[in-house]
């Protein structure tokens, strides 16, 4: 059955979910398949987190953090995340930066400072946006909203593999604890808590390959009458 959601001339597909649910990889592959732009919103928060560490801004100082975010020079070029003109793509994937990103994302002022930057990614021919509030806050008119989930054990295993491949040390027990703490923090924050949009399609990736997850998203997009 085709969706009754109004067609937007610049369509957006949102893929939300918790840390290490596979949303970033799935979003990138869907975007590549469709020839759409890609927004990795988590990278924006990680860049803000890295800046807060560098400039020694405390994670509970909401006003100072919002001011810092407003003045950041952030760019994405050829898949690389740059802070003040320097490629920090690998640095922002460190666990310490990820934990700081989750901590500063609880502040409404920080999230508000990043809203316009995220919405500016919407350009023709379309956008695939991944994050935690893409379908609920940033792009509520998205033509397709997907909410990825996976067991915490599956997510910890994926995260461990990612970190090891990037040359970071990782401990499974610590990763499990960190993921549970992040889930609680992301789901219980007052500003844009992690939750599926009312019209989001749930996709549990625990037992799925990346290819199967991507094909399911594309199948849902085709059901809307869109070429995929």
UniProtKB/Swiss-Prot annotation:
Cellular component, GO annotation: cytosol
Keywords assigned: ATP-binding, Cytoplasm, Kinase, Nucleotide-binding, Transferase
UniProt similarity note: Belongs to the cytidylate kinase family. Type 1 subfamily.
Gene this chain is encoded by: cmk
EC number, UniProt record: 2.7.4.25
Catalytic activity: CMP + ATP = CDP + ADP; dCMP + ATP = dCDP + ADP
Enzyme class per UniProt: transferase
Protein name in the entry: Cytidylate kinase
InterPro entries cross-referenced by the UniProt entry: Cytidylate_kin (IPR003136), Cytidylate_kinase_dom (IPR011994), P-loop_NTPase (IPR027417)
Pfam family, one: Cytidylate_kin
Organism of provenance: Burkholderia pseudomallei (strain K96243)
């Amino acid at each position: 059955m085709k969706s009754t959601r109004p067609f937007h001339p610049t369509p957006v597909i949102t893929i939300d979910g918790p840390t290490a649910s596979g949303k970033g990889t799935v979003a990138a592959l869907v975007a590549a398949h469709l020839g759409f732009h890609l927004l990795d919103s988590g990278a924006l928060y990680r860049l803000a987190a890295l800046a807060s560490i560098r400039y020694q801004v405390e994670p509970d100082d909401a006003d100072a953090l919002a001011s810092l975010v407003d003045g950041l020079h952030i760019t994405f070029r050829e898949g690389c995340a740059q802070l003040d003109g320097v490629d920090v793509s690998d640095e922002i994937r460190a666990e310490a930066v990820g934990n700081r990103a989750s901590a500063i994302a609880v502040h409404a002022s920080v999230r508000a400072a990043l809203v316009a930057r995220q919405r500016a990614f919407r350009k023709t021919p379309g956008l695939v946006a991944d994050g935690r509030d893409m379908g609920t806050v940033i792009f509520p008119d998205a033509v397709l909203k997907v909410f990825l989930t996976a067991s915490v054990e599956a997510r910890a295993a994926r995260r461990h593999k990612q970190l090891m491949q990037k040359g970071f040390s990782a401990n499974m027990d610590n990763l499990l604890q960190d993921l549970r703490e992040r889930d609680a923090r992301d789901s219980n924050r007052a500003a844009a808590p992690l939750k599926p949009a009312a019209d989001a399609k749930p996709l549990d990736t625990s037992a799925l390959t990346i290819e199967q997850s991507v094909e399911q998203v594309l199948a849902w997009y085709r059901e809307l009458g869109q070429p995929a």
